[in-house]
Amino acid sequence: MAMRSGFLDRRPVLVGLVFLGGCLGTLIRSVIAHAWPSRADGVPWGTLAINLVGAFVLATLLELLVHAGPDRGVRRAVRLCIGTGLLGGFTTYSALTVEAGQRVMSGQWLWGIAYLLTSVAAGALLAWVVIAAVRCVMGKRSS
């Protein structure tokens, strides 16, 4: 006897949620990028901010979902729509590599490499801090 899955566990629905989230995330990123354009001679603050906000929100979301229970039903739908879709479309590591590469190709190789490494390291550190903070808060709530 096959297990009956809920509406939100159906693959086409999940793919659609990723697509919708991705469209919305890309739209939000585009609005921010146009409002805060990168300059060739300075730090691309818009891209850096987008990626750090994305790392913060994704780490928070995933850690909260881990504490909420198994990855199925609404939790899976939220993870895929917001985590994979929206934040996948919102963050822009392709712009990060293009901006770093442009600096390297223009002779500012140290600046380009430093920007790339700093961005990735800052995102990873931010995610680690957020995960630790959520675990601390969630641990206190379950006590």
Curated annotation (Swiss-Prot):
Keywords assigned by UniProt, alphabetized: Cell membrane, Ion channel, Ion transport, Membrane, Metal-binding, Sodium, Transmembrane, Transmembrane helix, Transport
Record keyword Metal-binding present: yes
InterPro entries in the record: FluC
One function term, GO molecular function aspect: fluoride channel activity
UniProt membrane topology term: Multi-pass membrane protein
Activity regulation info: Na(+) is not transported, but it plays an essential structural role and its presence is essential for fluoride channel function.
GO cellular component term of the entry, any: plasma membrane
Subcellular location: Cell membrane
Any single biological process term in GO: cellular detoxification of fluoride
Binding site for Na(+): G88, T91
Membrane-spanning ranges: 13-33, 42-62, 80-100, 111-131
Keyword field contains Transit peptide: no
Catalyzed reaction equations: fluoride(in) = fluoride(out)
Major place of residence: membrane
Alphabetized Pfam families for the sequence: CRCB
Family according to the record: Belongs to the fluoride channel Fluc/FEX (TC 1.A.43) family.
Primary role: Fluoride-specific ion channel. Important for reducing fluoride concentration in the cell, thus reducing its toxicity.
Descriptive protein name: Fluoride-specific ion channel FluC 1
Native source species: Cutibacterium acnes (strain DSM 16379 / KPA171202) (Propionibacterium acnes)
